[in-house]
Protein backbone atom coordinates (compact mmCIF):
# COMPACT_ATOMS: atom_id res chain seq x y z
CA UNK A 1 0.00 0.00 0.00
CA UNK A 2 1.40 3.37 -1.03
CA UNK A 3 1.39 6.11 1.60
CA UNK A 4 0.44 9.66 0.61
CA UNK A 5 3.26 12.00 1.61
CA UNK A 6 2.49 15.50 0.39
CA UNK A 7 5.35 17.92 -0.11
CA UNK A 8 4.71 21.63 0.31
CA UNK A 9 6.61 23.40 -2.46
CA UNK A 10 5.33 26.92 -1.92
CA UNK A 11 2.79 29.31 -0.47
CA UNK A 12 1.22 32.23 -2.28
CA UNK A 13 -0.41 35.33 -0.85
CA UNK A 14 -3.41 37.39 -1.93
CA UNK A 15 -5.69 40.06 -0.57
CA UNK A 16 -8.57 38.29 1.19
CA UNK A 17 -9.96 38.43 4.70
CA UNK A 18 -7.04 40.79 5.40
CA UNK A 19 -4.68 42.74 3.19
CA UNK A 20 -1.89 40.97 1.31
CA UNK A 21 0.85 42.43 3.54
CA UNK A 22 -0.80 40.82 6.58
CA UNK A 23 -1.23 37.54 4.69
CA UNK A 24 2.50 37.57 3.91
CA UNK A 25 3.45 38.22 7.56
CA UNK A 26 0.99 35.57 8.76
CA UNK A 27 2.47 32.99 6.37
CA UNK A 28 5.89 33.87 7.80
CA UNK A 29 4.59 33.33 11.35
CA UNK A 30 3.04 29.98 10.47
CA UNK A 31 6.16 28.72 8.69
CA UNK A 32 8.37 29.81 11.59
CA UNK A 33 6.20 28.05 14.20
CA UNK A 34 6.07 24.94 12.00
CA UNK A 35 9.87 25.08 11.53
CA UNK A 36 9.29 25.09 7.77
CA UNK A 37 11.03 28.28 6.70
CA UNK A 38 12.40 26.25 3.80
CA UNK A 39 9.01 26.65 2.09
CA UNK A 40 9.12 29.60 -0.32
CA UNK A 41 6.49 32.33 -0.26
CA UNK A 42 5.43 33.93 -3.53
CA UNK A 43 3.64 37.23 -3.07
CA UNK A 44 0.46 37.67 -5.04
CA UNK A 45 -2.43 39.95 -5.73
CA UNK A 46 -3.02 42.98 -3.52
CA UNK A 47 -6.51 43.43 -4.97
CA UNK A 48 -9.31 41.52 -6.66
CA UNK A 49 -9.68 41.53 -10.43
CA UNK A 50 -12.91 43.51 -10.48
CA UNK A 51 -14.02 44.79 -7.07
CA UNK A 52 -11.76 44.55 -4.04
CA UNK A 53 -13.87 44.09 -0.91
CA UNK A 54 -13.00 46.00 2.22
CA UNK A 55 -11.18 43.87 4.75
CA UNK A 56 -12.66 43.60 8.21
CA UNK A 57 -11.21 42.90 11.63
CA UNK A 58 -13.22 39.68 11.93
CA UNK A 59 -9.96 37.76 12.48
CA UNK A 60 -8.21 40.73 14.13
CA UNK A 61 -6.37 43.68 12.60
CA UNK A 62 -3.61 41.36 11.38
CA UNK A 63 -6.00 38.69 10.06
CA UNK A 64 -4.62 36.13 12.51
CA UNK A 65 -6.11 37.06 15.87
CA UNK A 66 -3.83 40.05 16.52
CA UNK A 67 -0.68 38.17 17.41
CA UNK A 68 1.47 40.90 18.93
CA UNK A 69 4.73 39.10 18.40
CA UNK A 70 7.96 40.59 17.12
CA UNK A 71 8.83 38.85 13.87
CA UNK A 72 12.52 37.96 13.68
CA UNK A 73 14.69 35.72 11.51
CA UNK A 74 12.18 35.67 8.69
CA UNK A 75 12.93 34.38 5.24
CA UNK A 76 12.15 36.95 2.53
CA UNK A 77 9.60 36.23 -0.16
CA UNK A 78 10.81 35.05 -3.54
CA UNK A 79 11.32 37.70 -6.21
CA UNK A 80 9.05 35.73 -8.52
CA UNK A 81 5.38 36.61 -8.12
CA UNK A 82 2.63 34.16 -7.21
CA UNK A 83 1.02 33.94 -10.65
CA UNK A 84 4.22 33.19 -12.56
CA UNK A 85 5.29 30.75 -9.83
CA UNK A 86 1.98 28.87 -10.09
CA UNK A 87 2.27 28.62 -13.87
CA UNK A 88 5.93 27.55 -13.70
CA UNK A 89 5.31 24.97 -10.95
CA UNK A 90 2.39 23.54 -12.94
CA UNK A 91 4.82 22.91 -15.79
CA UNK A 92 7.60 21.54 -13.58
CA UNK A 93 5.24 19.16 -11.75
CA UNK A 94 2.79 18.53 -14.60
CA UNK A 95 0.14 16.00 -13.60
CA UNK A 96 1.52 15.82 -10.05
CA UNK A 97 0.81 19.25 -8.55
CA UNK A 98 -2.14 19.63 -6.20
CA UNK A 99 -3.06 23.21 -5.36
CA UNK A 100 -5.05 23.94 -2.21
CA UNK A 101 -6.55 27.40 -1.84
CA UNK A 102 -7.40 28.82 1.56
CA UNK A 103 -8.33 32.32 0.49
CA UNK A 104 -9.08 34.51 -2.48
CA UNK A 105 -8.81 32.90 -5.92
CA UNK A 106 -7.27 35.93 -7.60
CA UNK A 107 -3.86 34.30 -8.19
CA UNK A 108 -5.50 31.17 -9.63
CA UNK A 109 -7.75 33.23 -11.92
CA UNK A 110 -4.72 35.23 -13.10
CA UNK A 111 -2.75 32.01 -13.71
CA UNK A 112 -5.63 30.76 -15.89
CA UNK A 113 -5.73 34.08 -17.75
CA UNK A 114 -1.94 34.03 -18.22
CA UNK A 115 -1.84 30.38 -19.30
CA UNK A 116 -5.17 28.81 -20.33
CA UNK A 117 -3.62 25.32 -19.87
CA UNK A 118 -2.70 25.97 -16.23
CA UNK A 119 -5.56 23.97 -14.67
CA UNK A 120 -5.19 21.06 -17.10
CA UNK A 121 -1.62 20.48 -15.85
CA UNK A 122 -2.71 20.19 -12.21
CA UNK A 123 -3.40 16.89 -10.56
CA UNK A 124 -6.13 18.54 -8.45
CA UNK A 125 -7.34 21.96 -7.33
CA UNK A 126 -9.06 22.10 -3.94
CA UNK A 127 -10.90 25.36 -3.29
CA UNK A 128 -11.44 25.90 0.42
CA UNK A 129 -11.76 29.63 0.58
CA UNK A 130 -12.70 31.60 3.67
CA UNK A 131 -15.82 29.87 5.02
CA UNK A 132 -16.74 32.34 7.74
CA UNK A 133 -20.36 33.22 7.04
CA UNK A 134 -22.32 30.31 8.46
CA UNK A 135 -25.61 31.82 7.26
CA UNK A 136 -24.51 31.47 3.64
CA UNK A 137 -25.29 27.87 2.81
CA UNK A 138 -23.31 26.15 0.07
CA UNK A 139 -21.55 29.38 -0.97
CA UNK A 140 -17.97 30.28 -0.32
CA UNK A 141 -17.31 33.60 1.36
CA UNK A 142 -14.84 34.44 -1.37
CA UNK A 143 -17.50 33.48 -3.88
CA UNK A 144 -19.39 36.47 -2.58
CA UNK A 145 -16.45 38.86 -2.38
CA UNK A 146 -14.40 37.63 -5.34
CA UNK A 147 -17.22 36.48 -7.59
CA UNK A 148 -15.39 37.12 -10.86
CA UNK A 149 -12.42 35.01 -9.77
CA UNK A 150 -14.54 32.13 -8.53
CA UNK A 151 -16.61 32.14 -11.73
CA UNK A 152 -13.43 32.10 -13.81
CA UNK A 153 -12.01 29.13 -11.91
CA UNK A 154 -15.35 27.29 -11.87
CA UNK A 155 -16.07 27.75 -15.58
CA UNK A 156 -12.61 26.61 -16.68
CA UNK A 157 -12.63 23.87 -14.05
CA UNK A 158 -15.80 22.38 -15.51
CA UNK A 159 -13.90 21.63 -18.71
CA UNK A 160 -11.04 19.74 -17.06
CA UNK A 161 -13.08 17.01 -15.44
CA UNK A 162 -12.72 15.63 -11.96
CA UNK A 163 -9.75 17.74 -10.88
CA UNK A 164 -11.60 20.66 -9.30
CA UNK A 165 -13.14 20.33 -5.84
CA UNK A 166 -15.00 22.99 -3.88
CA UNK A 167 -15.05 22.37 -0.14
CA UNK A 168 -18.26 24.02 1.14
CA UNK A 169 -17.59 24.19 4.87
CA UNK A 170 -19.94 27.14 5.16
CA UNK A 171 -22.85 24.71 5.54
CA UNK A 172 -23.15 24.51 9.33
CA UNK A 173 -24.61 21.00 9.08
CA UNK A 174 -21.42 19.72 7.41
CA UNK A 175 -19.19 20.78 10.31
CA UNK A 176 -18.04 18.18 12.84
Predicted features along the sequence, with ranges:
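N-terminal acidic, glycine/proline-rich low-complexity segments
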Residues: 1-176
Amino acid sequence: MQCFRPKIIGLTTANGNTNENNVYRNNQRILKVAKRQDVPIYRGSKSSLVTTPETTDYFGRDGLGDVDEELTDLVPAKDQGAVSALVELSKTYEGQLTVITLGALTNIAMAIKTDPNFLSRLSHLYVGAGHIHMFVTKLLRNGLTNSFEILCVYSVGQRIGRKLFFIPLSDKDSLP
